[in-house]
Design a protein with these regions (language model features):
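Secretory targeting signatures
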Residues: 1-28, 45
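Generic detector of short, well-ordered, non-transmembrane alpha-helical segments enriched
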Residues: 8-9, 41, 97, 170
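Long, charge-rich boundary regions
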Residues: 2, 48, 95-99
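Short, conserved sequence motifs used for protein processing/export or organelle targeting and
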Residues: 32, 69-237
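Local sequence-structure signature of Cys/Sec-based thiol-disulfide redox active-site neighborhoods
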Residues: 26-72
Length: 237
């Protein structure tokens, strides 16, 4: 039995945005939004464990290491064991090797193994300060027993529309992950936040100030990895 479906991460992405590049070290209190990173990796990749461990150092409250509280999350997309992870990598033609970490849908990208957290910190700081659309997200996940999860997302565009932009058109992805993955990296250690499946993966159109909700029942036994193994053994934490 795997300790897993620990976290559901949802991202609401827009195709057009303004970017901002910080000139000095910043506090995450200056962030306009939480930064989400997608780590493209493979179990056979020699340099991938360094990426995973440095991302985890940033995520966790480790003395002497950077910490962004609730303003940074990441998922490990292990492409050689998961078709949907492989397809997600295919969304980015400029992502051609392992490991590669993209931030907020490729707002920033860091490629190759990493000897420290420095390059990831810089990418997070830059991405976290970009001008962003004001969207409220409410995420709820309840265990229904066995391998069934009841998942819902509420989204509100907290801005007034304009004549040229009367609605907000975006894309929402909600990732079902294992905090301690069933898959091991090249060093034989479990991945952090290993991707299993999407709860939601779709376009959305939001009206100003109006809440829109999505809900689904996700069943682990209905989904498989590339080896034909399903996820009916999930354990909700």
């Amino acid at each position: 039995m795997k300790k897993i479906v620990y976290i559901l991460i949802a991202t609401l992405l827009v195709t057009n945005f303004l970017s901002f590049t910080p000139s000095a070290e910043i506090s995450d209190e200056q962030f306009t939004h939480a930064v989400f990173a997608e780590e493209f990796t493979a179990t056979w990749c020699v340099y991938c464990p360094s990426a995973a461990e440095n991302l985890m150092l940033i995520y966790e409250d480790v003395p002497g290491e950077p910490y962004y509280d609730d303003n940074f999350f990441f998922v490990a997309l292990i492409t050689d064991v998961n078709d949907k992870a492989d397809e997600r990598m295919g969304d980015f033609p400029d992502v051609t090797g392992y490991p590669t970490v993209i931030f907020d849908g490729n707002d920033e990208k860091v490629s190759g193994g990493q000897s420290s957290t420095e390059n990831y910190e810089q990418a997070i700081d830059t991405t976290g300060q970009r001008d962003d659309t004001d969207i409220s997200l409410e995420i709820e996940m309840n265990h229904l027993g066995n391998d069934k999860l009841d998942i819902s997302i509420g989204m509100t565009w907290d801005e007034d529309g304009s004549f040229s932009n009367p609605t907000f058109n975006g894309y929402v992805r909600a990732y079902i992950v294992e905090k301690i993955s069933r898959y091991n990296n090249y060093d034989g250690d479990p991945y952090h936040f290993g991707f299993l499946d999407y709860a939601f993966d779709q376009t959305v159109e939001l009206e100003p100030r109006e809440k829109q909700s999505l809900s689904t029942i996700w069943t682990g036994g209905d989904h498989q990895d590339k080896n034909g193994n399903d996820f009916s053994d999930i354990d909700y934490d």
